[in-house]
Every structure is written in structure tokens, then in C-alpha cells.
């Protein structure tokens, strides 16, 4: 939703869309982020619960990058970079590339990795785009390399 508000401002020029993107991003960064930077998935009764899945990080990073593009406020770019680093730490598959859906803290028989789109784009597709956007904005080739490695598993399916 954050990305949609930022894009709506780009297309329609109404400042209320930029403000909506800011408010949503700020709410998540303030209320749904742990001290170590990890995200929560839900907010209910003024309480954050349930650790975020990879797709939550991917969409958040995309929203932060889009909010940075329309506001030029460095805090959103910095938050996007921090969340991308956190997502890599929690979900990255070092052996095959791409991101797992869950972090490694749960005792699962199999850690799933979804590279195919369904009703919404896959987390890996969204993350690849967000990483390429980070590369475009910062010029840091590491983001481009990470995006390439993110797409590696889809070439095998």
C-alpha cells in the first residue's frame, strides 16, 4: 500500500498521497519494528505480534524506496537499506540464491521459497525490483548483484 500511495502521487500529483505513504511507512517503522530491526507482521489492540515473513520485508522495502523517491527524505532510503540487510540475514539462501519465505528460527522440515507470482507478485520478484531500485538510486553495485542472485532460482524452474 505504501508503494501504491507513492506511485499515486507520481501520477496524480496530489500531496495527500505522499502524506499517506509517509504516515504508513512511519507507522510501521515506529510500531512494527523490533529493537534489532526485525519486523512484525500484525498490529492489534495497540500491540505488534507475529514475526514478519519474507514477503512482508520485500513489500516494505519496495514501499520505503518509493517513498524515498517522492519525498527525497534520506531516512526512508536508510530504512530501506537496513531492512534489505535484515531480510538477507534472516531469509537468504546462500547455497541456491533467492529468499526463503520464513526465517530459520522455526523447526520446519522444509523451508519454502516462492519464486513464482500468484494473486500478488512473489516476494522474490518484489525484492529483486527493490534491490535494483536501490542500485539505481545509490550506484552501489552490491544491490545489483544481490538482485541477480535473488533471481537465480527462477531460472531453474
Q: How would you label these PLM feature ranges?
A:
Residues 2-157:
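Glycan-recognition and catalytic cores of secretory/periplasmic carbohydrate-active enzymes
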Amino acid at each position: 500500500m505504501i508503494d501504491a500511495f507513492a506511485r499515486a502521487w507520481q501520477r496524480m500529483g496530489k500531496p495527500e498521497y505522499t502524506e499517506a505513504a509517509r504516515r504508513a511507512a512511519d507507522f510501521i517503522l515506529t510500531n512494527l519494528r523490533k529493537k534489532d530491526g526485525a519486523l512484525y507482521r500484525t498490529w492489534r489492540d495497540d500491540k505488534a505480534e507475529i514475526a514478519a515473513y519474507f514477503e512482508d520485508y520485500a513489500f516494505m522495502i519496495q514501499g520505503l524506496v518509493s517513498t524515498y523517491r517522492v519525498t527525497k527524505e534520506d531516512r526512508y532510503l536508510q530504512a530501506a537499506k537496513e531492512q534489505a540487510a535484515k531480510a538477507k540475514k534472516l531469509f537468504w539462501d546462500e547455497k541456491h540464491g533467492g529468499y526463503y519465505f520464513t526465517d530459520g528460527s522455526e523447526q520446519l522440515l522444509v523451508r519454502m521459497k516462492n519464486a513464482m507470482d500468484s494473486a500478488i507478485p512473489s516476494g522474490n520478484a518484489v525484492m529483486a525490483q527493490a534491490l535494483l531500485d536501490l542500485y539505481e538510486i545509490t550506484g552501489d553495485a552490491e544491490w545489483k548483484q544481490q538482485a541477480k542472485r535473488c533471481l537465480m532460482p527462477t531460472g531453474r524452474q
